[in-house]
């Protein structure tokens, strides 16, 4: 099982203990995970994603279980060439942060990025939030990703693979039930921010939208890696047998040339 929502690097708003690839590998082994799609934590707050991407690839050298999930900003010069190069270098997914870049739900730039990712057969990964509003720094002014952003990309119609991390039950249901069945199949969600017992939001969603719509994400080092595993273990017995999707089935092999 792959963790789709892990990060390395310093967090701009508070100190995090050991946000390093070697520590992440040990954490994944402890949790019984085979690898992770890894982002560079400072990147959402940097205008130019290129330096952060280079730092990410450099840091992950020698860590074969950690695959880079770099950032492509579709309003930045040369972004298409950058996307092709990142895919060839082995990017497992492409991250985008429309809320941090001031892009609305129907941004033409985000549409172009989604189409380019579909053409390159690489998942597009969106993050709803990094921290709860109650603990978010006043300097972090970006709002949470909206359901309208997710629906707009899912409705494009191309063979898009969209992975959304950090959503709660409300945003997930607002998005999912506003899509056609075909559009729903283009979106996968992690469940790190979805409540288990006693609210049992995860069990409800497994029953209503299906376990196969979910992938595994920890949001390390911002959140405890034990939370997703505990939520799965605390599901009712009849739901524990329903398997979530392994995100490794959504990404292509390292070094594939984009079509």
Question: Where are the regions that the model predicts?
Answer:
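Alpha-helical scaffolding segments of alpha/beta enzyme cores, especially the outer helices
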Residues: 23-26, 54-58, 81-85, 111-119, ...
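Active-site gating/metal-coordination segments in enzymes
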Residues: 34, 47-132
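Active-site environment of divalent metal-dependent phosphoester hydrolases
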Residues: 9-11, 43-46, 75-78, 101, ...
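Active-site neighborhood of phospho(di)ester-bond hydrolases with catalytic His/Asp-centered motifs
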Residues: 2-4, 37-40, 69-71, 95, ...
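Catalytic pocket-lining loop regions of alpha/beta-barrel enzymes
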Residues: 93, 106-215
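Short, flexible/disordered intra-domain loops and linkers
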Residues: 13-17, 45-47, 133-145, 229-230
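Structural motif corresponding to alpha-helix initiation and N-cap regions
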Residues: 18-22, 50-53, 76-80, 107, ...
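Mid-to-C-terminal alpha-helical segments outside catalytic/metal-binding sites
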Residues: 2-13, 17-35, 84, 204, ...
């Amino acid at each position: 099982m792959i963790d789709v929502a892990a990060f390395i690097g310093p967090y701009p708003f508070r100190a995090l203990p050991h946000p390093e690839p070697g520590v992440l590998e040990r954490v994944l082994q402890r949790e019984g995970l085979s690898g992770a799609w890894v982002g560079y934590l400072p990147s959402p707050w940097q205008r130019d994603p290129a330096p952060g991407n280079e730092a990410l690839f450099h840091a992950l050298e020698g860590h074969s279980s950690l695959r880079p999930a770099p950032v492509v900003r579709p309003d930045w010069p040369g972004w298409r060439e950058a996307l092709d190069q990142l895919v060839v270098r082995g990017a497992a997914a492409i991250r985008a942060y429309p809320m941090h870049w001031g892009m609305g739900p129907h941004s033409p730039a985000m549409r172009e990025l989604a189409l380019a990712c579909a053409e390159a057969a690489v998942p597009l990964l969106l993050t709803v939030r990094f921290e709860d509003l109650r603990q978010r720094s006043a300097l972090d002014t970006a709002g949470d990703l909206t359901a309208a952003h997710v629906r707009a990309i899912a409705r494009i119609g191309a063979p898009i693979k969209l992975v959304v991390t950090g959503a709660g039950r409300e945003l997930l249901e607002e998005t999912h039930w506003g899509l056609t069945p075909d559009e729903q199949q283009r979106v996968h969600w992690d469940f790190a921010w979805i409540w288990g017992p006693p609210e049992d939001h995860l069990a409800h969603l497994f029953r209503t939208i299906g376990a196969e719509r979910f992938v595994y994400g920890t949001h390390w080092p911002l959140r405890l890696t034990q939370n997703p595993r505990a939520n799965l273990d605390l599901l009712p017995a009849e739901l524990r047998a329903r398997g979530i999707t392994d995100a490794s089935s959504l990404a292509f092999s390292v070094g594939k040339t984009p079509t």
